[in-house]
Amino acid sequence: MACYIYQLPSWVLDDLCRNIDTLSEWDWMQFASYVITDLTQLRKIKSMERVQGVSITRELLWWWSMRQATVQQLVDLLCHLELYRAAQIVLSWKPVPESTSPLPAFPEAVKPGAVATSRRNLKDEQEKVRPVKPRSLLDTGPIMAGAQRQRPCEMDAPCSLKTDAPDSPQSKYCSTSTSAPKQERLLGLPGDRLFWSEADVVQATEDFDQSHRISEGTFADIYQGQRNGVAFAFKKLREVAGSSPGSMDRFLQAEMQLCLRCCHANVLPLLGFCTGRQFHSLIYPYMANGSLHDRLWAQGNSDMLPWPQRASICSGLLLAVEHLHSLDIIHSNVKSANVLLDQHLNPKLAHPVAHPHPDNKKTKYTVMRTHLFQASAAYLPEHFIRVGQLTKQVDIFSCGIVLAEVLTGIPAMDKDRSPVYLKDLLLSEIPNSTSSVCSRKTSMGKAVVKEICQRHVEKRAGLLPEACEEAWATAVSVCLRRRNASVEEARVSLAGVEEQLRGQLSLPWSRVSEATGSSSNTPEETDDVDNSSLSVPSLVMMASCPGAASSPLFTGHGAAQPSTSGRQEADSSSEACTGPQTPQNATETSWKIEINEAKRRLMENIVLYKEERLDSSELFGP
């Protein structure tokens, strides 16, 4: 085996790391000492086992692979240490050559032979004979002839990817996977206009004139065009340097499957396509307000987005990703530049780059070439960049970076900044909040929330209520955490923010501080339970109450919110919905139960343990 360790498939590395991680500490250190002779570096990698979700064997192999270690060296070391089970995992994998010829003929297969040339010639002849409007593109089954060979069987496919979709003529708005997508129904209509000829596309874009080009990407260029007085956006696909033959066709099939099978209010719909001999193109509606990236930094003389509009856009993004994940579809290209805004500033998630189903059904993820996504590295987790394992976690992490961009006003990547990536700036704040013994039991999410609220919240868009800041930052931390990241939990956090800000649309932003409570510099009488102990679901519940539009999200227990009975803590949620009480009885004695600080901290940790955000060792540890 002459290949390097970093060329091993992800499923092989997963099985190998799980096997070696189960070794005793003595056996593992013996294996690692042959790989790393520097004891300082070895101890650094060994200390990573305390971090949740980190495989120290994978970190060790990653360090070794960066030194050009080969698979043969790894197998020899495993056999020398008599770790035959781990060696068998590597030996059971055999690189599959791209050519179907026997192994001795592999050197000849490097050059294009007569067989490959004849196949290409046959394919060109078929393209010439093919009619201008092929009937296979008008069926509701496979989108192209090659798509039938790639898509999974009907038993394995999700409901939205199956061919037989129920007709629902009465439904005028498609947002779930139970009804037939609108674009998919259009394919079966006689005389539909979904298929565009090359002449139509050339005429609409004036032969892809440079003055019509909107943006330039890795896989395609976007042009603006017009047909019958209607503006369209044309995505002209192109071959990527170093890609395999036919990659453009596979990319076209994948994006068409995703757009046609997923009909959602926050996913950019497909209006047409063109599969000609000169170029391949996808046609979408033209988004008048550009992308979220442009509006965040006021590019193109656009106005600054206010907080209510920002919350609505982020909620729409999370709804789109949650819908795709419910269909087992991974977008893998979530970033602010791909969140397009229509004339009403409604978000539309666009430009997916992944296949609508995993290529490897055994491991349930797709191995992708990371060098094709270097431009999007600012939105990708470090684990994906290293290993190449594409899961739903990648989309959720990218959503967290977009939410952080909107909240902080800091670009995801800035070459003139240190660190360059916003994700490194946020994650670097976590160790600063883990210095004391008590804070070691605090989850990573709370540390991120505190740092974001104190240092990085955007000020140019106006004042944001403190409770909204915490809920928004909580949504960011939920997406960025390595274990149990949940797009649904982040959406619930933002739902409360959106509901609260929507009720304040009639108020000038200069008066928001008056409507949301006293200033942080004003002395305030409080009890021993601070606002940080309140959970995010309580924010959502209070924001949905009728009186929450004009009252603070978190009702205080001090002079501004005096108590008139001994059941104040039990009825705190109802007080938030009914509004503040009159201060006429503020001098009366307030009977309240004082909770021991250690007991309160234990109760909070038990809640985190039930949510699987805290290990038992951290719950009952020192």
From Swiss-Prot:
Compositionally biased spans, kind Polar residues: 513-523, 561-590
Alphabetical list of Gene3D superfamilies matching this protein: Death Domain, Fas (1.10.533.10), Phosphorylase Kinase, domain 1 (3.30.200.20), Transferase(Phosphotransferase) domain 1 (1.10.510.10)
UniProt GO MF annotations: ATP binding; protein heterodimerization activity; protein homodimerization activity; protein kinase activity; signaling adaptor activity
Residues in coiled coil: none
Keyword Magnesium belongs to the record: no
Region named Disordered: 511-532, 553-591
Entry-linked PROSITE patterns: PROTEIN_KINASE_DOM
Limits of the Protein kinase domain: 208-473
Binding site for ATP: 214-222, 235, 335-338
Reported tissue expression: Ubiquitously expressed, with a higher expression observed in brain, spleen and liver. Isoform 1 and isoform 2 are considered agonist and isoform 3 and isoform 4 are considered antagonist.
Domain annotation Death: ranges: 13-94
Keyword entries, A-Z: ATP-binding, Nucleotide-binding
One annotated GO biological process: canonical NF-kappaB signal transduction
Assigned protein family: Belongs to the protein kinase superfamily. TKL Ser/Thr protein kinase family. Pelle subfamily.
Function: Binds to the IL-1 type I receptor following IL-1 engagement, triggering intracellular signaling cascades leading to transcriptional up-regulation and mRNA stabilization.
Domains (record comment): The protein kinase domain is predicted to be catalytically inactive.
SUBUNIT field: Interacts with MYD88. IL-1 stimulation leads to the formation of a signaling complex which dissociates from the IL-1 receptor following the binding of PELI1.
Name used for this protein in its record: Interleukin-1 receptor-associated kinase-like 2
